[in-house]
Amino acid sequence: MDPVNFIKTYAPRGSIIFINYTMSLTSHLNPSIEKHVGIYYGTLLSEHLVVESTYRKGVQIVPLDSFFEGYLSAKVYMLENIQVMKIAADTSLTLLGIPYGFGHNRMYCFKLVAECYKNAGINTSSKRILGKDIFLSQNFTDDNRWIKIYDSNNLTFWQIDYLKG
């Protein structure tokens, strides 16, 4: 199953979507294993939406299909507590319009996810790089609170059984 249909069918609001693209201007400078992340907001007026932060537009909301344009690989993670995930998804909307960057009052994609989940009561550890605390994909994927429910490079269907309960 492709990631877009998987997310539309199975992913709860607030799921985090890690994605790698075939072409990315920032991927060579990014020490993160997964190069980009967004928060699955859910649906609004029948449109599936993702909140992300990009170097061109800062924090924005985009259609799920657009988020996946030119993707190479994708992974989707969730927490056991769906209510916490909903709070994080709702928080993501309050951050729309913040410019991209690493400084104060700036937001890059991994910081966006960390801030949304911090507001929901889930603190994320950071890595110290060049004297700054930076969030990377590893800060989420190496944290056992996060459950991988989809991996485009390793399609197994136990994830679907887990989601069905």
UniProtKB/Swiss-Prot annotation:
Coiled-coil ranges from the UniProt annotation: none
Gene3D superfamilies from the UniProt entry: endopeptidase domain like (from Nostoc punctiforme)
Keyword Cell inner membrane found: no
Keyword flag Phosphoprotein: no
Keywords, in A-Z order: Host cytoplasm, Late protein, Virion
A single GO cellular-component term on record: host cell cytoplasm
Protein's cellular compartments: Virion; Host cytoplasm
Other observations noted: Displays sequence similarity with a group of bacterial permuted NlpC/P60 proteins. Thus, the ancestor of the OPG091 gene might have been acquired from a bacterial source at the onset of poxvirus evolution.
Family that this chain belongs to: Belongs to the orthopoxvirus OPG091 family.
Protein purpose: Contributes to virulence in host but not to replication in cell culture.
UniProt protein name: Protein OPG091
Organism of provenance: Variola virus (isolate Human/India/Ind3/1967)
